[in-house]
């Protein structure tokens, strides 16, 4: 049997305004947590306004919680960054922090998803990637985001953690070099810029120079986690960046993570919490920040569809175990299947899973139907494609 996995969704309609903090019923919720999509209006350092696509996942109360500000990486193409990227791609990371007591806010920087403006790499090239300038642009965006978030009653004005992967990890190191008041830790998942094939880089000397500058200026402790099979920044490259950052005594710890999947570069957004939380928890504890769970992960007992072959059963078991917002699984009577992760809404997840299942069918066969949306089995809804 054949199947296609849809890992991202195209843009759709507008999101709720920042002022609307009530969870929308069509958005998946987890017991003990509140999740709300956001459009975050901010004012940049130059006085210009910007609008950032985001969502918050936080404990189900209005007590001020430490902020975990989480930001995105960069894809291979600008079209993906703009038209496919959405905050739910980092849902598993946000859920992990929220269930340990944080107001976890995923913010897409300018130029990504429905955020306004141009990406930090706009105007650059591999010959001239402008690493330092990119860091400055991202720093200004993220500092503005943190300021706006701290105006909310559920956000602590005195405690925050900066979290990012890939280019987002680099962005958080740049932000940390400004030593924002109340930021107590930086967590860098496979961070960097300008990777080509894991062996060559766009202006690697410039990248190392920027990291040396950030390390020299920061007083904030940081944790660096890099997977053994990171295809963008393999161990030698990761160690070179770490050495540059640590050169002048920056308070930083490096953790070599095990291999994950085919490319460990994406483990922050793809690996289960159990893969990476222990070293993060140890680091947070050392900074006197929350690290113990306040909400349990949902225990899903979804029956595996009997029509699936071994490949399909494995995919469904991974689906059932994954803690991600807005996902769906579709099947037909012959065992064709399609799965969608990282959609903006449950309707988009359903449509995508159905579409990819239908593409695998032989002509004349009965249509695919949704089997699950998020963590619930749904009544059969046959859709002819």
Which ranges hold each PLM region?
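Secreted/extracellular ectodomain signature
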Residues: 221, 253-254, 269, 273, ...
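Short substrate-entry loop that stabilizes the transition state in hydrolases
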Residues: 63-65, 73-116, 195-196, 231-234
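The conserved beta1-alpha1 loop
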Residues: 71-73, 226
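The feature captures the conserved acid-bearing segment of alpha/beta-hydrolase catalytic domains
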Residues: 185, 191-249, 253
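Catalytic histidine-centered segment of alpha/beta-hydrolase-like enzymes
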Residues: 260-272
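N-terminal cap/lid segment of alpha/beta-hydrolase-fold proteins
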Residues: 20-62
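Primarily recognizes the serine-hydrolase "nucleophile elbow" in alpha/beta-hydrolase
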Residues: 142-209
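Alpha/beta-hydrolase active-site loop
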Residues: 124-153
